Structure formats: structure tokens, C-alpha cells
Curated annotation (Swiss-Prot):
Protein family (similarity comment): Belongs to the glycosyltransferase 2 family. Plant cellulose synthase-like F subfamily.
Annotated positions binding substrate: D429, D431
Cellular component, GO annotation: Golgi membrane; plasma membrane
Record-given protein name: Probable mixed-linked glucan synthase 6
The keyword Electron transport appears for this protein: no
Positions in coiled-coil regions: 278-308
């Protein structure tokens, strides 16, 4: 039996595919079946029926926060007359909603807080501060923005949805007894741009995990896009293809999890529940040795290539000053980027390259050889076929805008169309590997369900390894993935976040959905006039939204429209007739069949090179109406947005064990630049023609709100910086945001803060995250707002006003510290950047402000401790949120907390002592009579102020 998969993003650590109790989990974190041996694999088919029935009870829920949606009201419901318990009539995934005991209070509290906040703002408007009108006006604007941004963030969370794939039903419908499958084809795109900054071993592990995934071999094709065009990347992939002939059969024989070799061999224990434990131990020892040799070859490739090239250049009589070519192992010159770059062989100037490392496998199973002297591993009962693997380095020429990752993805889309043309595409970053071998099947469940023909893409959450245990900079970001994205699944679906996303190919070609229903699974009738049939696609009865698919006609009979079989003029797709001919075949293939695999011949490869040419996209729709959208550094968000405004939906797929795992930048500088890139891209979308304010009426109203929030959140920096500095400075100036609070002020403030905390508790509950993660998320939000968000606003304003392009460096995945001594050494390596200036200033201002307040109380200028305490508490609230930032720029691991506290205390004491002992700072008032009440003058003419402050 295959490893069980369940939704919930880690909430169900021990559940089956439908949330039912699964077998006891191994200490490695995977279900027992993930470590089962050949005996378990061999018996899976014979016991499939019992396993399927046991794993797939509709409505079976094992989580206290979720309950199954009433299928009679869902767009995933079986047609009338279906038998509830019949396996063939069960959907391939089930939908859950939050229990009313959590959802109803959650919605009510949002309404209550909105009213309380409105009354609070009204009170603030009515009670002006005549002594500092600029302060009053600015604070009102800030409070209004905070309330507005909170509402933008909260409204899309009114209807969270959880979907759980049923892999048992999927296997029953699509897998056959002879080992073949009728699952649709799947092209997997992996992108890399620099084999130095993005370690080539990580890329190789990503490729190996894809080749070993549990998906029909003849339906799975892997494409690697190398934007550097370097021979190092190609030869590393060639080595990976060789090692895959051993690694992939080993994974299949013993049902290994995870199937990235680096992660697998790093497991502290390797429990095995099969019958052939001794054989497994011997096989594992052999494979481990081969993997160590493989890593040694990968790490030595750069030296080997340079040495080989020097030898060939010397043999060719290349003189000093002449271009020195980089040579392949077969004695031919590399057509891409050379080690010593020269004309036509630079990173931005080289020919296009398409090389097939592993060709299309046959449809029939191919068993491996038995154990022998030359082959110590017995693969006689294992299918040893490997998926197709293709290396692509698109052509680059000076004067052609290559559009970074978006351009690479579009080039891969065209190249894959002429080579494999699978109806579905999965994209992964090179530092992400498949952690759960069932991930591809789990994602495809959401593409093959009833009414799933309107689903454009399935987004998986991003999970990371190598993050420090305290997650100092909120790299996991589960509040966003398991909270926001899961909530959006109750509307039109989650946004596209750049990696771990499964696409329907035709959505990238500009096709529109066959139907439009913006209501979502729990509100199928929401949208009224917006829910309608756009056009009828062949193969589907359009009599009702829940119609079941009927036998589809051949792809060649796709309905002909204004532009033939294409949704827009042929010239919009480029000059390749071969590519244009693939579009109708991919436009609506039967979900129950896949195109026959065809060997990639020389003509097909030549065509793939042609469609990846640097000038191919000129005067076409690529980057605007077709493919990944250009014009922003966050091409992912705007690409998903363009699909949503056409009426397409998306789905969120969170399974356990996690589908994909990547590497996160744990260094503060790299993390800030990563957030700067994201926030800059969001603002670029806001100031472009893709502004969600002007999207089509096919966008769900609350989905539009979510996109507005995504494209405007960096503006928070302008108001947050004001609120994190002015209150502290008020201790020095004596002018405060609120001078005379009343009882109603405190009542409104208490309700606003209290409801916020309760809402956070409820959200933490249904999202399955911890309170600690919620706090960490808030802390890094403060750091990012004071640094990266502000920089993003300044950069985009500069771009809009002065028409200057924005460029970013590639986020480095290489550690700066000594990982052997400390795996988190990179966390505390200080790399100075201008993004750190603002948070440092805010920290100093709040420490100094608190010290001045303390000094004024000791000096007798202020006599009301309680009033001072409120402001000092807010200052320390700011410092608490910036503590991870301070910890990152001071000291070493384990010593940092002491260093930070000592510096804070030192600055505080020095400021207080200076204020008390330097007369000209505070004037002569401290030697006069006792301080009078607020608003009056002392005997020496110094005006006194009581302290009060409004929480933002």
C-alpha cells in the first residue's frame, strides 16, 4: 500500500488519505507503509480493494476543527442516484469546512471589531489635539489605514475550506492490474539560474526525487531550465541520470520515503517493516556508498571541466588572449556559457540548447536484472524504467529582454509542448524536492474531480528544512500558507506563489473556463449573474454545474472558433507551426487518457530549440496574454491573477508528509532582500494594468479584496514607522497622540484589542498552527515593515516617476558559516545592508524615549506612574517585536540574548542619567514647585503634560 496522504498542512500527523486513523507512524515521520519493503509493495495490488474501502469513508473526520461539507450542496457532489458507499461514485477528494462552533464566533467577532474600530476612529476624529494638529491628522490617517488593511486581510477568511485527496479512489479509477495507468501526462519544470549560488547538489536531488516519484513513468517528464547555460549544470544532471538507474529502482523496491537521497540518508533512523529486512540493510548500504561517490563526482565537476577544457585548448593550440572554449566529455565544444566567457558564450549571450538525458520510456513495465557479481542489487521484481529527462538552456542574445524566471518558464512551456505536451504542468524551484512520493497523485486528484475542468491550478504550501528551531525570521510562514491560502480555497482559490504549483496547460495558452461559478463550494450560487456557461467544451454535458463527464471525443474534434482551434490568433503564439498544432491536442484531452509517449527525435529537438530562441516572443502574446506574465518581479502572483479574472478557479493542497520541501534563507540580509523582492513585485502589480481594482466581473468579490490586500500591504510601512517612533519621541517633546482620553476611549480600545486577540486564537485553532508561530509571524512583520516594505515603496515610486527598471540579485542558497560545526551558523553571520538602518533607528528611538520617560518621573516632572507606564509598555511592545532583528545583528548563537539585553539596558541607563544631569535638556523646571496639573504652567514657565497614548 502506498503512503497515506491527508490534508491539513501537518495538522494530522497520523492520518490516512481521508483523515481516518492510519497505521502507526515510524520515527522518521512517515506512515509505516512508507517504509514497507518489497513484500508490502507486491501485496498492494492484491489487497487494493480492502485498502481502498477502509481508507475512503466520505465524511470521516479526525480533526476537531473541521467537518465534511454537505455534498448535496457542493459542486463536488455525486450525481443524483449515486450510491453513497459505492467506490466508483465517490469523489477523488473530499471538502471540509470549519465547524460552526468556531466559524460563527469568528465571523461575529470580525463584525464586532469592525464596529468597535469605527466608533474608535469617530471618537478620535471628534477629540482633536489643538497643540499638535499635524500629529493628530497623521495618527488618524495611520489608524484608518491599519483598520482598512486589517479588513482587507480578514474578509477573505470568512469561509476557510480544507480539501483532502482520496488516493485510494484515484488508484481504483486510473491504475490497472497489469501495472499500467491511464492517469494524464505531467510535465515537471525545474528552474535554476546559477549553479554557484544555487548548489548543484540540491538541484540534482530535486531531479532525483522527481524521477523517483510515485507517478506512471510513461506519463511523467522532467525538464530542467538552466538560465546560466553552463556545462557544470548539464554534466551534473547527466551524473544524476546515471545515479537514477540505481536510486529509483531502490526507492520502488523498498518504498523509500523521502525520495530525495540527501534528505533520506540524513534521517537519524531508517525503520523497516518489510519481511526482507536483511536485504534492505544490504541494499541501503550499497546505495549509500554509491551516493557518496555520486556526491564526490558532483563536487569535483567544476575542477574536472576546467582541467578537461585546459587540455583540449592546449591540444588545439589556443594562445594567450584567444577565446578559451569549454569542452564536453565527448570532445565537442559547449555551445552555452564558457568558463572564460567570450562572445557568443556568455551568460547573456549564447545559443539555445536542448539535450535529452533520458528518453521516453516504453508503456510496458520493464523488470530489472537479478542480483549478480556486476549488479549486487536484485531488481528482478522492480520496474526499472525512468521518466524522460530533458535539459534546456534557452537562447540569450544582447538586446533581447530575457524576462528572468517568467521568460524561462514560457520557454519551457513551448519546448515541452513539442516534446511531450502533457495536459498538466508542475513547476518547482531547484532547491525544492519531492518529499512525499504521493504528492503528484494528490495534486492531480483536484484536476480530475467533478467540475474540476474549471480549475486552473493547484497550489501546494511551501515547506522548508534547515530553518533554525526558533524560526527567528518566520521562514515557515504557516500563518500565510495554512491560514490565508486555505481560506481563499473557499472563494476562487489560493493565489499562485511561484513554486509547488500544478497547472492545467491550456490556462497558460489563454483559454477560458467552460463554466464560471464564482461562489465556491460552500456558496455555489453566490455571484448570481456572474455564474454562467461561457461555452461548451466537447466531452462535457453542460446541463448543470454538477454534470458528470461523458466519453470525450478525440482531441482533433475540439470546437472551432473565431481563430480556428486556438483562443486567439495563431501569430500570438509565435512562428512555430509545430507548437501551434500541439495546442488543440492539449486544449481538452480526456482526463481518463494520456497521449502516447513518442521518442524525442532530432526534428522534435530542433523544433524545441527553435521555440526557445531569444527572438521567438517578439510581436507575440507571450508575457501578456499567454504564459507567465512579464513586467513584475513577482510573475507568479500576476499570472495566477490573470487566470482568476477569466473565471478560472484554483485549489489548495496540503498533505502530510509534506509534498515538497525547500531551502529557506535563514540569514537576516538574504531574508530581507527576499521580502523586498516580493513586496516590490506586489506594488508593481498595483501600479500596472493588472491592478485588481479594475479586474473583470468574473473575479469573486472577496477574491478581489484578497488581491487588493496582496498588492497594497507594503504601504503599511509608511504608517507603521510613524507609530513606532512618534510615541517614543513624544516623551521628549511633550506632545502626545491622545491628550485627554475618556472612559469610552478605553472601552473602544479594549474591544478592538480584545477581539483581535480572540480572532487570532480562533485562526490559530482552525489553521493548525501554534501560538508561537503566530508571535514569530508578528515579529517578522514588524521587521519587514520597517525595512523591506519601506524600501519597496521607495523603489516602486522611483520606477513609476523616473521610469527606471528594478533589478534584484539571486537569493544565495550557499551557507556563509561552518555548517559542520553549527548547521545554523549562517543565521548569525552579519552582512550589512542599508535595509537595516531603519529598524536600528527605531530601536534606538524607543530605548531613548523610555529612558527619558523614566528620567522625567525620577526627576519629578511627571508624577503619574500609571500614565507613563502605558507609553513605556508600548515602547517595549515595539522592542519585543524587533527583538529577532536585534538578535540577528548582535552576537553569536546562544550568547545573543545576553548581548541584546545588555546593550538595551546600557543605552537606557546612559540616556536617563544624561537627561537628569544635563540641565539644558530639561530646563530649570525640576528645581521649581511641584508639577501642576495638565495644561497649566509651572512657576518657572515650563508647561507640563500628562501622558496618555492611543494604541494603534
Amino acid at each position: 500500500m502506498a503512503p497515506a496522504v491527508a490534508g491539513g498542512g501537518g495538522r494530522r500527523n497520523n492520518e490516512g488519505v481521508n483523515g481516518n486513523a492510519a497505521a502507526p507512524a515510524c520515527v522518521c515521520g512517515f506512515p509505516v507503509c512508507a517504509c514497507a519493503g518489497a513484500a508490502a509493495v507486491a501485496s498492494a495490488a492484491s489487497s487494493a480493494d480492502m485498502d481502498i474501502v477502509a481508507a475512503g469513508q466520505i465524511g470521516a473526520v479526525n480533526d476537531e476543527s473541521w467537518v465534511a461539507v454537505d455534498l448535496s450542496d457542493s459542486d463536488d457532489a455525486p450525481a443524483a442516484g449515486d450510491v453513497q458507499g459505492a467506490l466508483d461514485d465517490r469523489p477523488v477528494f473530499r471538502t471540509e469546512k470549519i465547524k460552526g462552533v468556531l466559524l460563527h464566533p469568528y465571523r461575529v467577532l470580525i463584525f464586532v471589531r469592525l464596529i468597535a474600530f469605527t466608533l474608535f476612529v469617530i471618537w478620535r476624529i471628534e477629540h482633536k489635539n489643538p497643540d499638535a494638529m499635524w500629529l493628530w491628522v497623521t495618527s488618524i490617517a495611520g489608524e484608518f489605514w491599519f483598520g482598512f488593511s486589517w479588513l482587507l486581510d480578514q474578509l477573505p477568511k470568512l469561509n476557510p475550506i480544507n480539501r483532502v485527496p482520496d488516493l485510494a479512489v484515484l488508484r481504483r479509477r486510473f491504475d490497472h492490474a497489469d501495472g499500467t495507468s491511464s492517469l494524464p501526462g505531467l510535465d515537471i519544470f525545474v528552474t535554476t539560474a546559477d549553479p554557484i549560488k544555487e548548489p548543484i547538489l540540491s538541484t540534482a536531488n530535486s531531479i532525483l526525487s522527481i524521477l523517483a516519484a510515485d507517478y506512471p513513468v510513461d506519463r511523467n517528464t522532467c525538464y530542467l531550465s538552466d538560465d546560466s547555460g553552463m556545462l557544470l549544470t548539464y554534466e551534473a544532471m547527466a551524473e544524476a541520470a546515471k545515479f537514477a538507474t540505481l536510486w529509483v529502482p531502490f526507492c520502488r523496491k523498498h518504498a523509500i520515503e523521502p525520495r530525495g537521497p540527501e534528505s533520506y540518508f540524513e534521517l537519524k533512523s531508517h525503520p523497516y517493516m518489510g519481511r526482507a529486512q536483511e536485504e534492505f540493510v544490504n541494499d541501503r548500504r550499497r546505495v549509500r556508498k554509491e551516493y557518496d561517490d555520486f556526491k564526490a563526482r558532483i563536487n569535483g565537476l567544476e575542477h574536472d571541466i576546467k582541467q578537461r577544457s585546459d587540455s583540449y585548448n592546449a591540444a588545439a593550440g589556443v594562445k594567450d588572449g584567444e577565446p578559451r572554449a569549454t569542452w564536453m566529455a565527448d570532445g565537442s565544444q559547449w555551445e552555452g556559457t564558457w568558463i572564460e566567457q567570450s562572445e557568443n558564450h556568455r551568460k547573456g549571450d549564447h545559443a539555445g540548447i536542448v539535450l535529452v538525458l533520458l528518453n521516453h520510456p516504453s508503456h510496458a513495465r520493464q523488470l530489472g536484472p537479478p542480483a549478480s557479481a556486476d549488479n549486487p542489487l536484485d531488481f528482478s521484481g522492480v520496474d526499472v524504467r525512468l521518466p524522460m529527462l530533458v535539459y534546456v538552456a534557452r537562447e540569450k542574445r544582447p538586446g533581447c529582454n530575457h524576462q528572468k524566471k517568467a521568460g524561462a518558464m514560457n520557454a519551457l512551456t513551448r519546448a515541452s509542448a513539442v516534446l511531450s505536451n502533457s495536459p498538466f504542468i508542475l513547476n518547482l524551484d531547484c532547491d525544492h524536492y519531492i518529499n512525499n512520493s504521493q504528492a503528484l497523485r494528490a495534486g492531480i486528484c483536484f484536476m480530475l474531480g467533478r467540475d474540476s475542468d474549471t480549475v486552473a491550478f493547484v497550489q501546494f504550501p511551501q515547506r522548508f528544512e534547515g530553518v533554525d528551531p526558533t524560526d527567528l525570521y518566520a521562514n515557515h510562514n504557516r500563518i500565510f500558507f495554512d491560514g490565508t491560502l486555505r481560506a481563499l480555497d473557499g472563494l476562487q482559490g489560493p493565489i499562485y506563489v511561484g513554486t509547488g504549483c500544478l497547472f492545467r496547460r491550456i490556462t497558460l495558452y489563454g483559454f477560458e473556463p467552460p463554466r464560471i461559478n464564482v461562489g465556491g463550494p460552500c456558496f455555489p450560487r453566490l455571484g448570481g449573474m456572474f455564474a454562467k456557461n461561457r461555452y461548451q467544451k466537447p466531452g462535457f454535458e453542460m446541463t448543470k454545474p454538477g454534470a458528470k463527464p461523458v466519453a470525450p471525443p478525440p482531441a482533433a474534434t475540439v470546437a472551432k472558433g473565431k481563430h480556428g482551434f486556438l483562443p486567439m490568433p495563431k501569430k500570438a503564439y509565435g512562428k512555430s507551426d509545430a507548437f501551434a498544432d500541439t495546442i488543440p491536442r492539449a486544449s481538452h484531452p480526456s482526463p481518463y487518457a494520456a497521449e502516447a509517449a513518442v521518442a524525442a527525435d532530432e526534428a522534435a529537438i530542433a523544433e524545441a530549440v527553435m521555440v526557445t530562441a531569444a527572438a521567438y516572443e517578439k510581436k507575440t502574446g507571450w508575457g501578456s496574454d499567454i504564459g507567465w506574465v512579464y513586467g513584475t518581479v513577482t510573475e507568479d502572483v500576476v499570472t495566477g491573477y490573470r487566470m482568476h479574472i477569466k473565471g478560472w478557479r484554483s485549489r489548495y493542497c496540503s498533505i502530510y508528509p509534506h509534498a515538497f520541501i525547500g531551502t529557506a534563507p535563514i540569514n537576516l540580509t538574504e531574508r530581507l532582500f527576499q521580502v523586498l523582492r516580493w513586496s516590490t513585485g506586489s506594488l508593481e502589480i498595483f501600479f500596472s494594468r493588472n491592478n485588481p481594482l479594475f479586474g473583470s466581473t468574473f473575479l469573486h468579490p472577496l477574491q478581489r479584496v484578497a488581491y487588493i490586500n496582496i498588492t497594497t500591504y507594503p504601504f503599511t510601512a509608511l504608517f507603521l514607522i510613524f507609530y513606532t517612533t512618534v510615541p517614543a519621541l513624544s516623551f521628549v517633546t511633550g506632545h502626545f497622540i491622545v491628550q485627554r482620553p475618556t472612559t469610552m476611549f478605553y472601552v473602544y480600545l479594549a474591544i478592538v484589542l480584545g477581539t483581535l486577540l480572540i480572532l487570532a486564537v480562533l485562526e490559530v485553532k482552525w489553521a493548525g498552527v501554534t501560538v508561537f508561530e503566530w508571535f514569530r509571524n508578528g515579529q517578522f512583520w514588524m521587521t519587514a515593515s520597517c525595512s523591506a516594505y519601506l524600501a519597496a515603496v521607495l523603489q516602486v515610486v522611483t520606477k513609476v516617476v523616473f521610469r527606471r527598471d528594478i533589478s534584484f540579485k539571486l537569493t544565495s542558497k550557499l551557507p556563509a558559516g561552518d555548517e559542520k560545526k553549527d548547521p545554523y551558523a549562517d543565521l548569525y553571520v552579519v552582512r550589512w545592508t542599508w535595509l537595516m538602518i531603519t529598524p536600528i533607528i527605531i530601536i534606538l528611538v524607543n530605548i531613548i524615549g523610555s529612558a527619558v520617560a523614566f528620567a522625567k518621573v525620577l526627576d519629578g516632572e511627571w508624577t503619574h506612574w500609571l500614565k507613563v507606564a502605558g507609553g513605556v509598555f508600548f515602547n517595549f511592545w515595539v522592542l519585543f517585536h524587533l527583538y529577532p532583528f536585534a538578535k540577528g545583528i548582535l552576537g553569536k548563537h546562544g550568547k545573543t540574548p545576553v548581548v541584546v539585553l545588555v546593550w538595551w539596558a546600557f543605552t537606557f541607563v546612559i540616556t536617563a542619567v544624561l537627561y537628569i544631569n544635563i540641565p539644558h535638556i530639561h530646563g530649570p523646571g525640576r528645581h521649581g514647585a511641584a508639577s501642576p496639573s495638565h495644561g497649566h504652567h509651572s512657576a518657572h514657565g515650563t508647561k507640563k503634560y500628562d501622558f496618555t497614548y492611543a494604541w494603534p
